[in-house]
UniProtKB/Swiss-Prot annotation:
UniProt function note: Component of the Mediator complex, a coactivator involved in the regulated transcription of nearly all RNA polymerase II-dependent genes. Mediator functions as a bridge to convey information from gene-specific regulatory proteins to the basal RNA polymerase II transcription machinery. Mediator is recruited to promoters by direct interactions with regulatory proteins and serves as a scaffold for the assembly of a functional preinitiation complex with RNA polymerase II and the general transcription factors.
GO cellular component entries: core mediator complex; mediator complex
Bias (Polar residues) ranges: 35-52
Name recorded for this polypeptide: Mediator of RNA polymerase II transcription subunit 14
Disordered, as annotated region: 1-30, 35-54, 1048-1108
């Protein structure tokens, strides 16, 4: 297999054959070697061992055999054949795609003549085929040339090796000659003349040598110090005259500041240099001469080196001679500018390898300096990452726009490119007197940092959160120290976020290093991210994490969203990608209530959400179709207080529980069609200044009596203010103590929320409640100053307060009715305890009109206690103490207390009827033993509280019955008890009751008044003496036999022995030996109560008393 050598130069400098030149030059000289001799690998001469005899070109080891870039002839021909085959296929496909020529047709038949086709399509195909053949022919001709040349490759390879070896040796020879000549030139400076030892010894010994030549120089006379001073003063005078008179118009503008002294003039250019010049002649046309030069900026060398001084003296003197002072200033000014640029470059290079390593890229231009800062701000792989750099160069100060500046001169100028854009509207000053590249970079970076933080501050300041001043946003800028520029944003009351820009790296640095901050810092340093959105995300995330942490520590549960995000579109219309949301639920709440916290830069929002509870069998439930039933936005008086109050979540529990209770109460009021107003009010006791829900209810629709049409009239204001006073947790043990079934509560949580609401009702006339104490009941208070009732209502969360409120209002109305009647009642009625659940008062007989002396001598009267229990809102329970005379009428009193205006009449009837019932008890107790011994019966029938019927049944042959009515009547404005006989036998001649009663009716007593057939006693103790007198008269009939029996005994025959006397049965007589009637007395002191027969009637009958 043959091999082909590629032309070129190897790594050791050897020449290589140029293959392309050979392939393109068909007629060139070619040499060939036999195909059996193949060169495969380059073997450098230094790598060959002397003991290796195998050399393909039979050359010594010192000659390097060139084999680099050799290619196998077989491989070359194979590739060429494959390429020719592929191009042939492509040509055939292209010819097939070309359209066929359309032959001419005659009468519909194609012409089949053998005439040559000269159509464009046919010619195009032929040209394509011809080009392909020519190209392939040329390639294969080249391959044939290479094949023929390869037959002579062995001889040519030796020639190439020899040529390269000879060329290398010639290069070495030329290098040695050049080095020798270089050393010879350098030795010229080290050459010393031959020493004159004879002359040296003579001079050292005698001080002079006679054979030394004498040049005949006359030394100038020595000058004394006074002459030297005078000479310098003269020189100063000449300089002053020349600069003032001759060269006044020739002095450059920047050389106006100069001083003269010590025989020289010093021109001072502030911030650049000062140069000392002098004159050598008093001719004003002669030039100035250079003496010294000093830099006037820092840092700069303290003095000039000898070489620089010599060069500068020659150059400045040359310029002074050619251009004068103007040329001198221009030359030195440009020299200083160049030196300043070099000094700034030196400082930049030191910074780039020092504290600012990997942050600066310093590049020296023609007469300028380019410094790129923040090179590591963006990742190296970031495409099209913006760059920032500065260019410090010399500004020509050429006038622009035809305006000529005053004394224009070149100066150092700085161009700033920020994020690939040149900043032209900002002039960055350079302190040319004190050069500091670090200070320049800090100034530029400070401005860049200011621009970044200002844009962020502007973007955040326009957010509603900061427009409404809910949080603090502070921007602090410093150009001298960019690291002190920072943007501070309040996250919570105690936490703030500080954003800085690293002055060296240009990356954002965020503090404090809490959990979301590293991610925020990474996002801020990512190209393409909006810093305002990132900072907003940090604030919302940090604040939400703080809320979740505090909420969990106070018994709040944070769960997954129970609804789909689409359901929140109607609630949260201003959602952003940086928002944060959390669903809170308090332990003890029902599962359909949640608090949704939505934090955003547009403002924080808190929503109370009530979800639907679909049936488990419904399709919506199986599909997870829980929807939002009610949503109420929680309004806070101060939104900033959300994060500031440590008791925020306890206040939130208070507020949301109140809202849930309010929602239930509003639905109840709506269902009952009671007018109301929902108006939130601020409760000062809450630290967050939360607007608590308050409901104002129209009282006249709850209590119809307040409409003014009732008998009581309007006694209270027509509104009740209902608000939540407290929220408490009720444990399961308290539920058990209440007697509730534990198994019925198995689905509830162990801790339940109890709402304590406060209802305020203001009375119109507070003097009518003066008998009340400030603490009416354990949950009712009355303010005597404002005349306001404060009711405490308790219920579980989610239950309505309206039923309890209506019940309490009705109780207050009954209490008002009773207290009004107490104020109008006789003086015998006194209140002892007045609460909303229980009223205790005492009563006694009506006071008699006696003098004060007699009243003081009378013993105190017995007072009887009455308890009115209002615990049951539907009824009033009346309780009398033991042995109270009114016990026999307790049922009627109970009915009276629960009747309309009954509580108003009760205090009137009790002292008015006390004497009557006490007399009846006394008479009943006196007849108790008589009834046991069958001597007669005494019965009381209480038809009404002011009407009683008493009946006497005496034994005898015929029934003897006396029936009397005791009725309260009013005559001439005075109350009295009228006692009269109501049976059918008062006019019989043999009526013994009329005989004994006549004595009573006709008796003149100061305690009652006789009315011939009846008597009338006052409501005080007089009626009691009247009834006892009647009873005493009736009991006289028990000692003598009846009048009828005496007459019968006179006509009755003597009874024979063995006969039984015939005794007439009396239906109601006590002498009947038959079974005892139910009305017989029982045991104990309450026998009178058990003996009475009460007829159920209405509590108030038709009587003559007018109580209005």
């Amino acid at each position: 297999m043959a091999a082909v050598m590629m032309n070129g130069v190897g790594p050791d400098g050897a020449m290589k054959p140029n293959l392309d030149q050979k392939l393109n030059n068909h007629g060139g000289d070619t040499k060939a070697i036999s195909s059996s001799e193949i060169v495969q690998q380059q073997t450098p001469a230094r790598s060959l061992q002397s003991d290796n005899p195998l050399r393909m070109n039979d050359l010594p080891d010192e000659i390097v055999h060139i084999t680099e870039n050799f290619l196998s002839l077989n491989q070359l021909l194979s590739r060429l054949a494959q390429r020719s085959h592929n191009e042939l296929e492509d040509t055939i496909r292209s010819l097939a795609k070309k359209p066929l020529p359309m032959p001419p047709m005659l009468n519909g038949n194609a012409d089949h003549n053998t005439i040559e086709d000269l159509s464009n399509e046919n010619l195009d195909k032929k040209v394509t085929l011809l080009k392909f053949a020519q190209e392939q022919h040329a390639k294969w001709v080249k391959a044939l040339v290479i094949t023929d040349w390869s037959k002579k490759a062995s001889t040519l390879s030796k020639l190439i090796d020899l040529k390269v070896h000879m060329h290398t040796q010639m290069e070495k020879y030329d290098f040695v000659l050049d080095r020798m000549m270089h050393n010879k030139r350098n030795l010229a400076y080290a050459r010393l003349p031959s020493p004159d030892l004879k002359t040296a010894l003579e001079v050292l010994a005698n001080g002079d040598a006679p054979w030394m030549p004498d040049l005949g120089y006359i030394p100038p006379p020595e000058m004394s110090p006074e002459d030297q001073l005078k000479w310098l003063e003269d020189l100063d005078t000449l300089l002053s005259l020349r600069l003032t008179i001759d060269d006044h118009d020739k002095i450059p503008y920047h050389f106006r500041n100069y001083r003269i002294g010590s025989g020289r003039v010093t021109f001072i250019v502030k911030g650049e240099f000062e140069v000392d010049l002098t004159i050598a002649d008093d001719d004003p046309e002669k030039q100035y001469w250079f003496i010294d030069f000093r830099f006037l900026f820092r840092p700069a060398p303290p003095g000039l080196s000898e070489n620089l001084r010599m060069y500068l003296e020659l150059k400045v003197n040359e310029v002074l001679g050619a251009e004068g002072l103007a040329g001198c200033y221009k030359y030195l000014h440009e020299l200083v500018l160049t030196h300043k640029i070099n000094e700034l470059r030196r400082q930049a290079m030191e910074l780039s390898v020092g504290r600012w390593v990997d942050a600066l890229n310093v590049e020296r231009l023609n007469r300028s300096l380019a410094v790129q800062y923040w090179t590591s701000r963006y990742p190296a792989k970031a495409p099209n990452a913006p760059k920032s750099w500065i260019i410090i160069g010399v500004h020509s100060a050429a006038p622009s726009g035809g305006l000529r500046a005053t004394a224009p001169t070149s100066r150092l100028a700085l161009r700033w490119f920020r994020d690939n854009q040149e900043v032209k509207d900002i002039e960055i000053p350079l302190d040319e007197a004190d050069l500091s590249m670090e200070r320049i970079l800090k100034d530029v970076i400070g401005r860049h940092t200011q621009q970044i933080l200002t844009l962020m501050h502007t973007g955040l300041r326009n957010k509603p959160r900061f427009v409404n001043k809910e949080d603090h946003l502070v921007l602090e800028l410093s150009r001298k120290q960019p690291s002190e520029s920072l943007l501070t944003m309040q996250l919570t009351k105690l936490d703030s976020m500080v954003v800085r820009v690293d002055q060296i790296g240009g990356t954002f640095a965020v503090q404090p290093r809490t959990r979301p901050m590293p991610m925020a810092e990474s996002n801020l340093n990512t190209p393409g991210r909006d810093p305002v959105a990132v900072i907003g995300w940090v604030r919302n995330t940090f604040a939400m994490e703080e809320l979740v942490r505090r909420g969990k520590s106070q018994g709040w549960v944070v769960g997954k969203p129970p609804v789909k995000p689409d359901d929140l579109r109607n609630i949260l219309s201003n959602r952003e990608q940086t928002d944060a949301m959390a669903w809170f639920r308090k332990q003890g709440w029902r599962p359909q209530f949640y608090v949704l916290a939505h934090l955003s830069m547009s403002g924080d929002q808190w929503w109370l959400i009530e979800l639907t509870t679909p049936n488990s069998n419904s399709a919506a439930s199986t599909a997870g179709g829980i929807r939002i039933r009610t949503h109420v936005q929680l309004q806070f008086a101060s939104k900033q207080a959300i994060m500031e109050s440590p008791s925020f979540f306890s206040d939130l529990n208070y507020f949301t529980s109140a809202m849930i209770s309010k929602m239930r109460d509003l639905r109840e009021l709506h269902s009952r069609r009671i007018n109301h107003i929902d108006q939130p009010c601020i409760r000062p006791g809450l630290s967050s200044n939360i607007r608590m829900p308050t409901i104002f209810i129209r009282t006249s629709e709850v209590l119809p009596s307040l409409s003014g049409k009732g008998s009581l009239g309007r006694w209270a204001a027509d509104e009740v203010r209902l608000s939540v006073a407290n929220v408490q947790s009720s444990s399961s043990t308290e539920v058990d103590r209440r007697g509730e079934n534990r198994s019925a509560l198995s689905t509830r949580m162990d801790s339940r929320i109890v709402i304590a609401s406060e209802a305020r009702l203001r009375v119109l006339d507070k003097s009518k409640f003066r008998q009340l104490s400030s603490r009416v009941d354990r949950d009712v208070a009355f303010n005597h100053k404002t005349g306001e009732f404060v009711l405490q209502l308790r219920s579980e969360l989610g239950e309505t307060m309206i039923d309890k409120l209506i019940s309490r209002l009705q109780t207050i109305e009954r209490l008002y009715e009773f207290l009004g009647s107490i104020s109008r009642a006789p003086r015998g009625v006194q209140c002892e305890t007045v609460t909303l659940r229980r009223v205790v008062f005492t009563y006694s007989d009506l006071p008699q009109p006696v003098s004060e002396e007699l009243a003081a001598l009378q013993p105190p009267t017995k007072r009887w206690k009455v308890v009115l229990d209002f615990a049951d809102p539907r009824t009033v329970k009346l309780v009398l103490e033991k042995n109270n005379p009114h016990i026999r009428a307790v049922d009627m009193l109970q009915t009276l207390a629960n009747s309309p205006r009954g509580l108003e009449r009760l205090p009137f009837y009790l002292p008015t009827t006390l004497a009557v019932y006490r007399a009846l008890d006394s008479i009943s107790d006196a007849w108790l033993q008589l009834q046991v011994s069958r001597k007669g019966t005494f019965e009381i029938f209480t038809k009404n509280i002011d009407l009683a019927t008493i009946r006497y049944d005496l034994p005898g042959p015929q029934a003897r019955r006396l029936t009397l009515d005791v009725k309260l009547v009013s005559r001439r404005g005075e109350l009295s008890w009228h006692v009269k006989r109501t049976d059918a036998e008062p006019n019989k001649s043999n009526d013994e009751f009329s005989r004994v009663l006549k004595e009573v009716w006709n008796t003149k007593s100061p305690n009652w008044k006789s009315l011939s057939t009846s008597a009338c006693g006052p409501a005080s103790a007089g009626v009691e003496e009247l009834l006892k007198g009647i009873d005493k008269a009736v009991r006289t009939l028990l000692e003598s036999p009846p009048l009828v029996l005496q007459q019968q005994q006179q006509r009755q025959p003597v009874v024979q022995p063995g006969q039984q006397p015939q005794v007439q049965n009396q239906a109601n007589g006590v002498m009947n030996r038959g079974p005892q009637r139910p009305g017989l007395p029982g045991a104990g002191g309450l026998g009178a109560q058990m003996r009475q027969k009460q007829v159920p009637q209405a509590p108030m009958g038709n009587h003559v008393v007018d109580l209005t």
